[in-house]
Regions:
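Conserved N-terminal structural module of periplasmic/extracytoplasmic solute-binding proteins
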Residues: 11, 21-97, 284, 392, ...
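Extracytoplasmic/periplasmic substrate-binding proteins
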Residues: 39, 49, 224-305
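Extracytoplasmic "Venus flytrap"/periplasmic binding protein-like
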Residues: 52-120, 129, 151-154, 247-249, ...
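Hinge/lid segment of periplasmic solute-binding proteins
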Residues: 94-143, 161-167, 174, 278, ...
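Long, aromatic- and glycine/proline-rich binding clefts that accommodate carbohydrate-like moieties
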Residues: 128, 278, 327-382, 406-408
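Extracytoplasmic/periplasmic solute-binding protein
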Residues: 135-139, 144, 164-211, 255
């Protein structure tokens, strides 16, 4: 009911105006006092954004900030909204958007949905939507890349087959030496192989929970191709679940290449290893498609200042502020025109992640995606460690996921 009332109030201020001009027409509520949640590494940027917002528009909005991880921000909005003070604007990862919307915790984007649809990458616009409506304001994206030791691999790997060949004379499990590491059991990292030949998690671009594609012939073909990489990665995936173990071995020079994301760059810099970063190599001539994670600013449906909150969230997604965020935090904006500017003099890691971003798919944001992770981890373990036939492992995972979805309906 509250959501409907807020939407009516906002729309009354925007009637008959094109969506991009709506934000310019709305004025924040008198005495607006906004609470902003973002992760700790982004707090300095967010404080700058708030000052810039007031300065650019002549507002006198009060702001307070709290460092909160995106997954915790979404959980708090769901659990505490309506019973305790929650953020007016929070930043979350897009795969949590569906749960948040279903729980009634997020307002629609009522000021700039058309601008976002026409400006941002398709992955980002899809990530900002749920059930055909726009909720999120995209502010950055991340995906996986290949980090490699330049002392061990002087030439940047272009194919996984090159890494397999290197591993023939390098691998030594007793000495914890491996040509390649990644978190095998983590579907976020291994999905690039399941989708190698065109398979998908959910149909209709990740929105149809009744069309589960993880056991299709194409998915089976992809996972069989992944098993080739045992020759490069003979590690025990259970032992390598801990990211610090994998990254530590890479930093010690015992691992030639590791699949990781931009969140690991600072640690690799501190390790002193001479490393390079490239997009994910091809396997059997196919370009793997990684998951991308889109960071969204969302407006709480419980905000007492919905106009001010919508305006600030919109400001965070403006090209000016996306570029400033990149300059302050290295967070890559999901806008092609900005990526073209950044890539001209980008460092190696940023270049690789931008390049891989064009071969990535936004994680499905429907709530049913949450039922996929554990069964897929078990399926990957069964086929990789226990050598269970791929079709059996994937069929079993699909049956479990379908049961869980049916139970929730």
């Amino acid at each position: 009911m509250r959501n409907t009332w807020i939407k009516t109030v906002l729309l009354s201020a925007c009637v008959s105006l094109p969506l991009w001009s709506q934000a310019e027409d709305i004025q924040p509520e008198a005495g607006s006092d906004l609470l902003i949640w973002t992760d700790s590494s982004t707090l300095d940027y967010m404080k700058y954004a708030a000052e810039s917002f007031n300065r650019d528009f002549g507002y006198d909005i009060k702001f307070s900030f709290r460092g909160l991880a995106p997954i915790d921000a979404a959980s708090r909005l769901i659990q505490d909204g309506g019973s305790a003070r929650v953020a007016d604007v929070a930043e979350i990862e897009h795969d949590l958007l569906g749960r948040l919307v279903v729980a009634g915790g997020a307002m629609e984007n009522l000021v700039s949905s058309e601008r976002i649809l026409s400006t941002f990458l398709p992955n980002a616009t899809a990530a900002a939507q749920y059930a055909g409506s726009n909720y999120g304001f995209p502010v950055s994206y991340a995906t996986l890349a290949l980090f490699y030791n330049k002392e061990l691999l002087p030439a940047a790997p272009k194919t996984f087959e090159e890494i397999i060949q290197f591993g023939n004379g390098f691998n030594d499990a007793k000495a914890n030496r491996y040509a390649l590491l990644w978190d095998i059991q983590n579907y976020y990292e291994s999905r690039m192989f399941l989708t190698l030949y065109g398979a998908y998690e959910f149909g209709n671009q990740g929105t149809d929970a009744k069309d589960l594609g993880i056991d299709s012939p194409l998915a089976q073909q992809g996972m069989n191709a992944m098993k080739m990489l045992k020759a490069a990665n003979p590690s025990n995936p259970v032992d390598m679940r801990n990211a610090q173990v994998r990254r530590g071995l890479f930093g010690e020079g015992k691992v030639a290449a590791i699949i990781d994301g931009p969140w690991a760059i600072q640690g690799y810099d501190n390790s002193g290893v001479n490393y390079g970063v490239v997009p994910i190599p091809t396997l059997k001539g196919k370009q793997p498609r990684t998951f991308s994670t889109v960071r969204l600013a969302v407006v709480s449906s419980y905000s007492e200042y919905p106009k001010a909150s919508q305006l600030f969230a919109d400001y965070l997604s403006s090209e000016k502020m996306l570029l400033k965020r990149y300059q302050m935090t290295k967070s890559i904006p999901p806008v092609e025109s900005l990526m073209e500017k950044i890539i001209v003099d980008a460092d190696e890691a940023t270049y690789a992640i931008i390049a891989q971003g064009f071969h990535s798919d936004a994680m499905p944001s429907i709530p049913e995606m949450g039922y996929l992770w554990s069964p897929m981890a078990s399926a990957i373990t069964a086929m990789w460690v226990n050598d269970q036939p791929v079709n059996q492992a994937l069929d079993h995972a699909k049956s479990i996921i379908e049961e869980q979805i049916a139970y929730q309906e």
